[in-house]
From Swiss-Prot:
Stated name of the protein: Venom protease
InterPro entries listed in its UniProt record: Peptidase_S1_PA (IPR009003), Peptidase_S1_PA_chymotrypsin (IPR043504)
Lineage per the UniProt record: Eukaryota, Metazoa, Ecdysozoa, Arthropoda, Hexapoda
Post-translational modifications reported in the UniProt record: Contains 3 disulfide bonds.
EC number: 3.4.21.-
Molecular functions (GO terms): serine-type peptidase activity
Keywords per UniProt: Allergen, Disulfide bond, Glycoprotein, Hydrolase, Protease, Secreted, Serine protease
UniProt similarity note: Belongs to the peptidase S1 family.
Expression by tissue: Expressed by the venom duct.
Domain of life: Eukaryota
Organism: Bombus terrestris
Amino acid sequence: VVGGKPAKLGAWPWMVALGF
């Protein structure tokens, strides 16, 4: 869980946002 969002549900959005 990253930023309070399950990786399975928000993987790409936060990965792209964080630069991963």
